[in-house]
Design a protein with these regions (language model features):
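Helicase motor core with emphasis on the C-terminal RecA-like subdomain
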Residues: 1-189
Length: 189
C-alpha cells in the first residue's frame, strides 16, 4: 500500500531566534527544557565539535543527551542511536549524518543550532519532528554576524546553469555511446 500524506504538516510550528556563539548552548538548553510533555528533542549542528558542545550543555542540565556524528566509532554511533530510539536518551545533538532511514515518531522538537546548508536540508531535517501527528516545534537559531558569510559560501558551491547543461550533455552522449534504452537517473546532493 502507498499512502500520500501530502506535504502540509499542520502539526509543526516554526520559529527562528538570533543567537551568538556564547549564548547558543544556553538557548538550546532552555528550548529543550521548555518542551511540554514526553517526547524527544533533536538538535542539528553544523560540525562535529558543535554536536559535542551542545550535548555537553544538555547533559549539564542534567538531561540524558549525547552527540551523534560520523567521527564517532561505529559501535558508539549504534549505541547512541539505539539509546535515542528506545527513549533512554531524551535528546541528541547531531550533524546531518543523522537521519537517513531513522524513524522516531515522537520527536517533539527539532532545533537547528546552526543554519543548514540549504532550504531543502532544513525542511527535510525539520520534518523529522512530529511524525506521529502530535504537535511539535522546529526552531532555527542563527548568528546574525555569520549569515552573510554563510550564504556567500553556499552560493559559491552551486553549479551554474552552464555547468548543469554540460553535465546533461555528457550524460546524453554517454547514453548514446552505450546504446542504452530507458532513463538515466542522476542524483545531485
Amino acid at each position: 500500500h502507498l499512502f500520500d500524506g501530502g506535504a502540509a504538516r499542520t502539526n509543526l510550528s516554526f520559529d527562528a531566534a538570533p543567537v551568538t556563539k556564547l549564548s547558543k548552548p544556553g538557548l538550546v538548553s532552555e528550548t529543550v527544557v521548555a518542551q511540554d510533555g514526553p517526547g524527544a528533542s533533536l538538535v542539528y549542528c553544523a560540525t562535529r565539535r558543535e554536536t559535542e558542545r551542545m550535548a555537553e550543555a544538555l547533559a549539564a542540565i542534567p538531561l540524558d543527551a549525547a552527540a551523534y556524528h560520523a567521527g564517532l566509532g561505529r559501535e558508539t554511533r549504534h549505541k547512541v542511536l539505539d539509546d535515542y530510539l528506545s527513549g533512554r536518551l531524551t535528546a541528541i545533538a547531531a550533524t546531518n549524518a543523522f537521519g537517513m532511514g531513522v524513524d522516531k515518531p515522537d520527536i517533539r522538537q527539532v532545533i537547528h543550532a546552526d543554519v543548514p546548508g540549504s532550504l531543502e536540508n532544513y525542511l527535510q531535517e525539520a520534518g523529522r519532528a512530529g511524525r506521529d501527528g502530535a504537535p511539535a516545534s522546529c526552531r532555527l537559531l542563527f548568528d546574525p554576524s555569520q549569515i552573510e558569510g554563510h550564504f556567500q559560501r553556499q552560493s559559491q558551491n552551486r553549479l551554474t546553469r552552464r555547468e548543469i547543461g554540460r553535465v546533461l550533455k555528457a550524460l546524453r552522449e554517454m547514453a548514446q555511446r552505450f546504446a542504452r534504452d530507458g532513463e538515466i537517473i542522476v542524483s545531485v546532493d
